[in-house]
């Protein structure tokens, strides 16, 4: 995965910089997301890995995407096909999404709780994280009964483990040392 990210980064950065310059970040995110889905299609995958000429592959890919790609999106596909890099489109789309969140001063936070959180609890967690991180926070909530009680919050590099299972694990580590 790290190798794909390394290969995808220059394409994602160039696309993002261009999208910001043209004030089209949202439309570029949609285009790249759609192109990533096409590249992951089980019918398309063997073609991307095959020995088809780059111009023919780019034309086929653009035809499949149809109206979902504008002229500039088509140019990106042509360049990536020329360099044999269409298979990294999902990584390009993922990096673009990360750049977009950073640019918009937003961060996604994964909140795992032992039980379903109420809307008020989700709002309280969101407000607290926004104050702490000085960014707009989008919560992705899930339930894991294995936590016993409490929550685990992951937002970028920040991890807050307020779960009973986490506290028990830390207590066990202290007792064993």
From Swiss-Prot:
GO cellular component term, pick one: proton-transporting ATP synthase complex
Single annotated GO MF: proton-transporting ATP synthase activity, rotational mechanism
Domain of life, source organism: Bacteria
Subcellular location(s) of the protein: Cell inner membrane
Keywords carried by this UniProt record: ATP synthesis, Cell inner membrane, Cell membrane, CF(1), Hydrogen ion transport, Ion transport, Membrane, Transport
Stored InterPro entries: ATP_synth_OSCP/delta_N_sf, ATPase_OSCP/dsu
Membrane topology: Peripheral membrane protein
Primary site of residence: membrane
Subunit annotation: F-type ATPases have 2 components, F(1) - the catalytic core - and F(0) - the membrane proton channel. F(1) has five subunits: alpha(3), beta(3), gamma(1), delta(1), epsilon(1). F(0) has three main subunits: a(1), b(2) and c(10-14). The alpha and beta chains form an alternating ring which encloses part of the gamma chain. F(1) is attached to F(0) by a central stalk formed by the gamma and epsilon chains, while a peripheral stalk is formed by the delta and b chains.
Family that this chain belongs to: Belongs to the ATPase delta chain family.
Functional note: F(1)F(0) ATP synthase produces ATP from ADP in the presence of a proton or sodium gradient. F-type ATPases consist of two structural domains, F(1) containing the extramembraneous catalytic core and F(0) containing the membrane proton channel, linked together by a central stalk and a peripheral stalk. During catalysis, ATP synthesis in the catalytic domain of F(1) is coupled via a rotary mechanism of the central stalk subunits to proton translocation. This protein is part of the stalk that links CF(0) to CF(1). It either transmits conformational changes from CF(0) to CF(1) or is implicated in proton conduction.
NCBIfam families, A to Z: ATP_synt_delta, PRK05758.2-2, PRK05758.2-5
Name this protein carries in UniProt: ATP synthase subunit delta
Provenance organism: Shewanella amazonensis (strain ATCC BAA-1098 / SB2B)
Gene responsible for this protein: atpH
